[in-house]
Amino acid sequence: MKSIVVIEDDAITRALLQQSLRRDGWRVLEAEDGETGLNLVVENRPAAVLCDLHIPRRNGFQVCRMLRAQPDLAGTKIIVTTGSRFGNDRLTALEAGADDYLVKPVLPADLTRVLPNVAADPAPNGQVATPPTANDAIELTNTGLFKTSFPDDSDLRTVVRFWGVRGSLPTPGPTTVRTGGNTSCVEFRCGDQIIILDAGTGIRGLGSSLAKEFRGRDLHLTILISHTHWDHIQGFPFFGPAYSPTNRLRILGYESAVGGLRTALFEQMETAYFPISLSQMAGRVVFEELEDMRFQIGPVAVQSVFSNHPGICLAYRLTTPGGVVVYMCDHEVYLRQERLTQERAGKPNAAAIEFARREDEKIARFIGPADVLICDSQYDEEEYPSRLGWGHTCMDDTVALALAAGVKRLCLFHHDPDHDDAKIDSMVAHAKELVTKSGKSLEVDAAREGQEIVLKAVKR
C-alpha cells in the first residue's frame, strides 16, 4: 500500500486530508510539527509528503530543504499545502524542493490531480536514510530552559515604548515628525526584564537611551525578531550596546523561509554593505532559533502564531502580571485578501471564503482580550486593492479584528512610508468612527515614536 506523511498542525485540515487520502487507498501517517514529520518520513520512506508551510518545530520550507538533502528520499514527492497565496512563498517552496504547491482549502480533486501517478513506497536500496539536520552551521542554545510560570510576588509593571513605528523604510522629515519615521522597534519591560521587539532603525535611538541608563552597569536584554525583512533588522548594526563587551544580548526568532536567523543578520553586515562585521561586535551576542510556539522570557510568558505575510513571520502575545500585549507587525487579513482575489479572477469559491474566515477567527482567538494590540494598519480601503498580496492589512480590517478579539487598546502600527502625520491622523479618526458604529468599546490611536504605555500588575 502506498503511504503518505501529512504534516499539518490544524486538526480540522489534517482530518479532512486523512479522510480523502484513505478513501483513495493511502496509508496515512500524521504529524503536527515539522520535526515529528521529518522523523516519520525517514522511518517510513513514504511515496509522498503533504506539508504545510506554517508549522512549529521546523517550518515547511525547512522540511522541503532537509528532505531534498537526503539522496535516499529522492523518489518521495513533496506537496506543499498552505493558506499562503503569496507568489514569493510559492517560488521559495519550489526552490526548496517542493514538487507542487496547493493553496488551502485543499479539495479531493486537488489531491487526485497532484497524486495521480505516484508509485508505491520506494524500496530500500541498501542505504539507510539518516535524520535530516539543519544545513545552517549555528550552535543553538536550548530554549527549553525558560521558566514556565510567574513569580509568586508578581508586583511588576509592564511598560511599552515605541522607538520605530514605520513600515517598509525610514521616512524622516518635517511631515512625519509627530508620528516618527523610524522602522519597527518596540521596547517592552516587565520588572527588570528588557525585551526589544524587532530591530528596525528605531533600535539605534533605543540603544543610545539604554547606554545612558546603564552607564557603568552590565546590560542584559532579549531581542525578539518577528521576521527578517529589512525594515525589521536594518537597525541592528547601529545598536550601540552590542559593541560593549560587558553586555549580553539574546536574539530570539524563527528560521526564515530561506535560512537561519543569524545568517540574515550576518549577511547585512558583510563587507559589501557595512564596514563592521557581526563577529567584530564586542558584546556577548547569543542567537537562539525558536521552535516551539510557547516559551518564557523571565516573568514574561510568550506565545507566537504565524501571521499572513510572505515568508515566515510571527506575531507575539506577551503575558505579564500587568496584562497582555500582542505584537502583530506584519499581517494581511485573510478574508479581504481572498474576496478580492476571487473577484479579480472571476472564480467564486465558497469553500475558500469559509477557510479564510476561519483563519481570521484563529487570529482573533490568539489575540484574545488583550490589553494592548500593536497591529499592522498600513493601508486604507482605497490603497489596499493596488497592494493586494503584499502582506499588509487595510486599517478597517485591523479595527474589525481588534473588536472581534475584545481588545482594550489598539495601536495602529507599521505606517506606510507615504503616510504623513495628517494622513495618519485621518486614519485614526476613521478608526474611531468605526468603533463608534460598532457600539463596542475600544481605545484607538496611532503608535508614535516616544509614546509610552504602562500596565500595572493587579495584586491578588
Where are these regions (language model features)?
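Charged docking surfaces used in two-component/phosphorelay signaling
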Residues: 15-23
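Binuclear metal-dependent hydrolase catalytic cores
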Residues: 123-341, 421-460
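Conserved acidic carboxylate
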Residues: 8
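C-terminal output helix
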Residues: 106-115
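Cap/insert and terminal regions of metallo-dependent hydrolase folds
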Residues: 335-442
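The feature encodes the CheY-like receiver
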Residues: 56, 74, 86, 104, ...
